[in-house]
Design a protein with these regions (language model features):
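N-terminal secretory signal peptides that target proteins for export/translocation
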Residues: 1-13
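N-terminal export leaders
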Residues: 16-17, 289
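C-terminal segment of classical bacterial N-terminal signal peptides
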Residues: 27-36
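C-terminal His-loop and adjacent cap/lid subdomain of alpha/beta-hydrolase
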Residues: 38-705
Length: 705
């Protein structure tokens, strides 16, 4: 296995070109002077300081860490152009200085001796209040990572041995208002009409629960049921059946609904439309992230002389995300929030996991950032709108020209972007729009400050269980992206600090035939596997009609939008942005993207999509993928009629399998998609998976004595 120690090839000369660009941007950015009108953190309170944390564990060369918990209080100038994009900010209450106030809690981990750290901060843009950095950090997880004391876990972790500081803070209204159990929350103002009266408007809930009641994001403005409607259906494409008024009711304060005499049926689809009141100004969450990171990076103290615990130390801030916060940071860039009111850069690089081309249901009146569209759920919430790509494109529907990097380009505050995502995003979130024009007819060249990486055949987020089907038709997809993420993180850091470019984008393309429609099945490449249903089910990205002024104001007057069955590929539901999916090889594994060792030396078919089972059969199984084992032997294959070669036909001996796995891992290290330190664990995992097939067996002669 000595070959696993090979180093990556020399870096491309293109880094010299990028260095000149970086130098120019940096030189220009240092000339910007913040104005007196800057939005800012005015007050910070520290509620907990644990020094040392991690049970006193000390990393060689870095030392011990401390944990700091507290609350940050901020204010925004509603008239500043940087904040004017926040929907309803001019209708939020103001203090005596004419500013809009908010607060959020935070969680910091930092070296006690900052001089021993690497002067870089990892900002965890939390998912619905919970921390996400476990996807990168090798087993160190939970919402209070500082409480971990196991020496082996801490020694093996990824970020802290390198001296990173860590920060997380609340930004998401859907995380609630309870900070218990280290939940990170934000307290937001409620918008009022200019005359001080209560704002009301249409609101919508998609309900999938087995409970007796379903909470509402916003309280009902009236308990008069004639101004509300509850519907029920089993399949996405069933005609919704109206639940009679006598069949449901509000609770006393209009904050939840319940069925009369029964519970909601788990996994059935209920939709509730009603008139709501008191919208929170959720778009302030963008500014809260911006201003807290600006304070951490640039300020010495708050207005009350409380010292910034990171003062004078921060040279770089990178983000880490998973899913929902990645979508938030997509809109964060689009709306220009990487520049403070004084045009100071906030993030040097954004590392997004499973965000792809999507946005977030946040900067709209009566929005709910906790929702997420997939291939069955939450289809009608406002989530993903043009622009989808980082570079500027023209929307063939609206005629607008824009890109996610346009605003930061104008202020010279663009972050580097590492966009890492799964196959699932193509099937349920139209990820192809990240790198095609809006008509799906031409590949985009890619923005020079961003890279796009598909993890081939991967499901959304965490690995699935190969021994469980859950609510899906097939067993879970076990592919794990974490080693690739760590390698790309290192590449991102070198890009930011040294100008060494990361590997080129790895996505399916129209030009090479690896980006295709899901139907017909033969053109998509997916084989006819016995017992596996393939329907080509893929979500459709529409430009929905939320009312005449929605796309200019963020205020919905038609909510939910009017749609009809079928849900997908139906022009009656609105203009369509065509999207495509990755083509597969003869085994059903995707051709383009970063192919993990499991895909390069397969024993299964791995898919980023899956279908539901039971009474909901053939509806989408949301973020779940699937895996279908190859036949173990040729006899099994012939008997079942499976077109895929069996395991024994592919790998006639243990050593054949062993050396193919070793080559796959070596290649990933050479390509900079795996760190040498992760190679051994990958080898062991692959060997164990091979043994589990029963067709790969180590013989006595395979043992090196």
């Amino acid at each position: 296995m000595g070959a696993l120690k090979r180093m990556a090839p020399a870096i491309s000369r293109r880094k010299l070109v990028y260095l000149s660009v970086v130098g120019a941007l940096a030189a220009t950015a240092t000339l910007v002077v913040p104005t007196a009108a800057d939005a800012r953190i005015t007050k910070v309170t520290i509620t907990t300081k644990e020094s040392p944390t991690f049970g006193g564990y000390s990393w060689p060369g870095v030392g011990q860490y401390e944990k700091i918990l507290g609350t940050a209080y901020g204010e925004l100038d509603p008239n500043d152009p940087h904040n004017a994009v926040i929907v309803d900010i001019k209708l939020a209450p103001r203090n005596a200085a004419g500013k809009v106030e908010y607060s959020h809690n935070f969680y910091l981990l930092k070296p006690i001796d900052l001089a021993k750290g690497n002067h870089k901060v990892v900002y965890d843009a939390v998912n619905r209040g919970s921390k996400t950095f476990s996807v990168l950090n090798r087993g160190l997880n939970g919402d209070d990572p500082g409480s971990v004391t196991d020496a082996q876990t801490l020694a093996n972790t990824f970020l802290f041995p390198k001296g990173y500081s860590y920060a997380a803070s609340g930004w998401d209204a859907s995380a609630g208002t309870d900070p218990a159990n280290f939940n990170l929350i934000i307290n937001l103002p409620v918008a009022k009409n200019l005359d001080g009266t209560t704002i009301t408007g249409p609101a919508y809930e998609y309900i999938v629960t087995s409970g007796a009641s379903a909470g509402l994001t916003y309280a009902a403005a009236t308990l008069n049921k004639s101004q509300a409607k509850l519907t029920h259906r089993v399949h996405l494409d069933d005609v919704p059946q109206v639940v009679p008024d006598a069949g449901w009711d509000y609770n006393a304060d209009g904050t939840s609904i319940h069925l009369v005499g029964s519970n909601f049926v788990n996994n059935d689809i209920y939709e509730f439309s009603y008139v709501a009141k008191n919208p929170t100004v959720n778009g302030i969450g963008f500014a809260a992230v911006r201003d807290f990171m600006e304070w951490i990076r640039y300020e010495a103290e708050d207005d009350f002389k409380l010292a910034n615990p990171m003062a004078g130390d921060v040279n770089r801030i990178y983000t880490i995300t998973r899913s929902q916060p990645a979508r938030m940071l997509n809109d964060f860039r689009t709306l220009g929030f990487n520049a403070s009111e004084g045009n100071r850069k906030v993030f040097d690089a954004i590392f997004n996991w499973v965000g792809a081309a999507d946005g977030i249901n946040m900067n709209y009146r009566f929005s709910n950032p906790g929702t997420t569209q997939r291939n069955r759920q939450d289809q009608l919430y406002p989530e993903a709108f043009f622009p989808f790509a980082n570079e500027s494109t023209t929307d063939h529907i609206s005629g607008m020209t824009a890109g996610r990097y346009d605003k930061c380009t104008a202020t010279i505050t663009c972050p580097l972007g590492m966009e890492v995502y799964s196959s699932n995003e193509y099937w349920v979130k139209a990820a192809s729009l990240f790198h095609t024009d809006t008509q799906g007819t031409a590949d985009l060249p890619g923005h020079p400050l961003a890279r796009l990486y598909l993890i081939s055949s991967h499901q959304h987020s965490n690995p699935g269980n190969v021994n469980s089907k859950g609510s899906c038709q097939q067993f879970g997809n076990p592919l794990a992206s974490e080693p690739v993420q760590r390698a790309l993180w290192e590449a991102m850091d070198k890009w930011s600090t040294q100008g060494i470019e990361p590997p080129p984008s790895m996505v399916p393309r129209l030009a090479d035939g690896t980006l295709v429609p899901p139907l017909p099945q033969s053109a998509a490449g997916f084989p006819n596997i016995p017992g596996v249903t393939y329907t080509g089910l893929k979500s459709t990205r529409y430009r929905f009609n939320y009312g005449p002024n929605f796309y200019a104001t963020g205020i919905m007057t038609t909510y939910p939008p009017v749609v009809s069955s079928p849900m997908f590929d139906n022009l009656a539901n609105g203009p369509i942005y065509p999207s495509l999916v990755p083509k597969t090889d003869v085994d059903g594994n995707e051709i383009a993207g970063i192919r993990l060792p499991d895909v390069r030396v397969p024993i299964r078919t791995y898919s980023g999509w899956s279908l539901r089972s039971g009474v909901w059969a053939n509806d989408g199984c949301e973020g779940s993928g699937q895996s279908v084992a190859f036949p173990a032997t040729k006899a099994n294959r012939v008997a079942s009629g499976d077109p895929r070669l069996s395991v024994e036909e592919r790998y006639p001996t243990f050593l054949d399998y062993y050396f193919k796995v070793a080559k796959a891992i070596n290649d990933m290290v050479a390509e900079r998609f795996m760190l040498p330190e992760d190679a051994g664990a990958a080898m062991n995992r692959m060997l164990n998976a091979g043994f589990a097939t029963g067709a790969i067996k180590m013989e006595p002669e395979d043992v090196d004595e």
